[in-house]
Swiss-Prot record:
Cited function: Cell wall formation. Catalyzes the addition of glutamate to the nucleotide precursor UDP-N-acetylmuramoyl-L-alanine (UMA).
Organism: Streptococcus mutans serotype c (strain ATCC 700610 / UA159)
The organism's taxonomic lineage, starting at the top: Bacteria, Bacillati, Bacillota, Bacilli, Lactobacillales
EC number: 6.3.2.9
Pathway, per record: Cell wall biogenesis; peptidoglycan biosynthesis
Chain residues that bind ATP: G119, S120, N121, G122, K123, T124, T125
Coiled coil: none
GO CC annotations, alphabetized: cytoplasm
Protein name according to UniProt: UDP-N-acetylmuramoylalanine--D-glutamate ligase
UniProtKB keywords: ATP-binding, Cell cycle, Cell division, Cell shape, Cell wall biogenesis/degradation, Cytoplasm, Ligase, Nucleotide-binding, Peptidoglycan synthesis
Length: 451
């Protein structure tokens, strides 16, 4: 790694732990910083803080005392999930203390070039696709960032022979100053995380940070299905490589059923290992990055044919007696479930849906569920989903949890059918998170397969 001098003998406050904060604290100590960690969780319930203290790093836990900022900190490294309205962050900015995220640290020390991927939907799938394609082609791609591997940790051992493929959230990008990927992708831009950013305009501004240090030597891959992306394309120094499923563009595009790049047919959309129109978009973004990285058409096709998806994101589990199972537990809203259903023939789909009741009516889901073979409904939102099923003319059955729903769905299925867990709701009424919900689906699938 690059041994940058930016933090040497400087006081740095790491605000918020979790994996990224813990990794940042260790890295800063390696770089010679005088590190203080502040986390809201009490010390005796905080194994990360305990481990850092044993390593000689100062930790203050249980609250966020504003007087802590009376010290002359040169930087604050903020956990991405902590909003800028947090009193500690507000006070730091008032004192002109630079507030950064650990992604900025990763960039400063990385010897490897960076491919950054952001967007409202499809980030994780596209990031994983890109890394898989590059690795299949014999390159050395390392996943990092919002995908679960702290960027500042992954960046330490890499060399110029590696490539950091980094998933980036708007929260992370807000805390960047010099961050400069040589290639970047914005999958799409939808009005999300408005509670954090305050407005859609602020959210776009945070996402747009991905390109702010890019030059004409760099490449920015944008989704030209969106007029917003076309407008933004005029506001960057980077070379634009568009992708689209609606028109032929000077980049990656869908021509009939063929996925193409600048006139070359790469593969048929029907060959993709994951279904859904959104995954065609993800694949096109991947193709653009792969071709810019010198990957052969054959290597791209081989990878995308066998790509089984990312865990809990329209993940293909396999089949039992000709019935296919897909785990899309990450679909915590209506739009995500609509996209999941777009990849299937409704007459063969048994949909498992329901979860936390946020007061949503499901009227906009009605056109998408028409013609479903059946629905298995569970959770707090069950009454509202049942109403939507009746409107759509779909037969539904009740289940107490995902395990029971999966068994009922399999009993109702015939060879050639699809059992799809795509809840259209958050999980917190019954499960700690969508991962636990999805894991229950996977466990039940494995149990059924073994019976």
């Amino acid at each position: 790694m690059k041994h940058v001098k930016n933090f040497e003998n400087k006081k740095v406050l790491v605000l918020g732990l979790a994996r990224s904060g813990e990794a940042a604290a260790r890295l800063l100590a390696k770089l010679g910083a005088i590190v203080t960690v502040n986390d809201g969780k009490p010390f005796d319930e905080n194994p990360s803080a305990q481990a850092l203290l044993e390593e000689g790093i100062k930790v203050i836990c249980g609250s966020h005392p504003l007087e802590l900022l009376d010290e002359a900190f040169a930087y604050m490294v903020k956990n991405p999930g902590i909003p800028y309205t947090n009193p500690m962050v507000v006070r730091a900015l008032e004192k002109n203390i630079p507030v950064i995220t650990e992604v900025e640290l990763a960039y400063l020390i990385s010897e490897a070039p960076i491919i950054g991927i952001t967007g409202s939907n499809g980030k994780t799938t596209t990031t994983t696709m890109i890394a898989d394609v590059l690795n299949h082609a014999g390159q050395s791609a390392r996943l990092s960032g919002n995908i679960g591997f702290p960027a500042s940790e992954v960046a330490q051992p890499v060399t110029e022979k590696d490539i950091l493929v980094m998933e980036l959230s708007s929260f992370q990008l807000m805390g960047t100053e010099s961050f400069h990927p040589h290639m970047a992708v914005i999958t799409n831009l939808m009005p999300t995380h408005i509670d954090y950013h305050g407005s859609f305009e602020n959210y776009i501004e945070a996402k747009w940070n991905i390109q702010k240090n890019m030059t004409k030597e760099d490449f920015l891959v944008l989704n030209f299905n969106q007029d917003l992306a076309k407008d933004l394309a005029n506001q960057t120094q980077a070379k634009i490589i568009p992708f689209s499923t609606k028109e032929k563009v000077d980049g990656a595009y869908l021509d009939g059923q063929m996925l193409c790049f600048k006139g070359q047919a790469i593969m048929s959309a029907s060959e993709l290992g994951v279904p859904g129109s959104h995954n065609v978009e993800n694949a096109l973004a991947t193709i653009a990055v792969a071709k810019l990285s010198g990957v052969s058409n054959e290597a791209i096709r081989e990878t995308l044919i066998h790509f089984g998806g990312v865990k809990h994101r329209l993940q293909s589990l396999g089949n039992i007696a000709g019935v296919k199972f897909y785990n899309d537990s990450k679909s915590t809203n209506i739009l995500a479930t609509q996209k999941a259903l777009s990849g299937f023939d409704n007459s063969k789909v048994i949909l498992i849906a329901g979860g936390l009741d946020r007061g949503n009516e499901f009227d906009e889901l009605v056109p998408d569920i028409k013609g479903l073979k059946k629905m298995i409904i569970l959770g707090e939102s069950a009454p509202r989903l049942k109403h939507a099923a009746v409107q759509a003319g779909v037969t539904y059955l009740n289940a107490k949890d995902v395990a029971q729903a999966t068994r009922i769905a399999f009993q109702e299925a015939s060879p050639g059918d699809v059992v799809l867990l795509s809840p259209a709701n958050a999980s917190w009424d019954m499960y700690k998170n969508f991962e636990v919900r999805g894991d229950e689906f996977i466990t039940t699938f494995k149990s059924l397969k073994g019976e």
